[in-house]
Amino acid sequence: MVKIRLSRFGSTHNPHYRIVVTDSRRPRDGGYIENLGHYDPRKTTENYLKINAERAAYWLSVGAQPTQTARRLLKAQGVKVA
């Protein structure tokens, strides 16, 4: 199953996340199909959340399932999530 989920990067005590499309059987930080954007939970910059809404809508239309956190972030960016 194809999922839209967060993949962690950054350093110790300074997490950043990529919002990626990946196969659900892959490891959290393993390879992914497409990178949709990024999220900084510490909100250290003005653009702490950036998502390519057009590509996210495409992946949702072909059946990708977002995780609960990814769904919340997609909604925050105005992407229609069923």
Curated annotation (Swiss-Prot):
Pfam families according to UniProt: Ribosomal_S16 (PF00886)
Keyword Ribosomal protein: yes
InterPro entries, per the entry: Ribosomal_bS16 (IPR000307), Ribosomal_bS16_dom_sf (IPR023803)
Coiled coil: none
Keywords annotated in UniProt: Ribonucleoprotein, Ribosomal protein
GO terms of biological process kind: translation
Cellular component annotations (GO), alphabetically ordered: cytoplasm; small ribosomal subunit
GO terms, molecular function: structural constituent of ribosome
Family according to the record: Belongs to the bacterial ribosomal protein bS16 family.
Protein name from the UniProt record: Small ribosomal subunit protein bS16
Name of the encoding gene: rpsP
